[in-house]
Amino acid sequence: MNKIAKIAALAALALTCVASTACADFNADKSITVISREEGSGTRGAFVELTGVEQKIDGKKVDMTTDDAQITNNTAAMLMTVAGDEQAIGYVSLGSLNDTVKAVKVEGVEATAENVADGSYKIARPFNIAYKADGQSDLSKDFVAYIMSAEGQAIINEHGYVGSNDAAAYAGNGAEGKLVVGGSSSV
């Protein structure tokens, strides 16, 4: 059985609309270059759902991303593509934001961890940890406990995501070994 630990307080994914830092050179007479993530990307899925780009048609969810969108396959490529085109707009996780692009205000609200935490920045979703609950190793349990601890949450906050400020201190269970972890390019 798979278990998903929702980490709403741990790491709200603020899907931040980003534009080139060269926006002073933006030409309103030119077309905007839409940059999107690949189909199947969790970041894309959240973005289209939260912004209304995903619509229900005949009872099925349909991603209405423009066919003209340039597609990138990871966060770094999204940032590089947007940074290289002053007419471009795309989206990344808040914690992935860097100085090569700038966040676009949504409904007049800046994309900050504080605004995500207080709910005023609306384009946000939780990150999740998925693992097998049956037969979970002591090492795996310890890793999840660390992530959810005050120390783990501090790392989340330091990287621009939204962590919980009321988590308990990490106690640890003394487990040692090798743990293989996979996940999103958004973190």
Residue ranges, per PLM feature:
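Sec-dependent N-terminal signal peptides of Gram-positive bacterial secreted proteins and lipoproteins
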Residues: 1-25
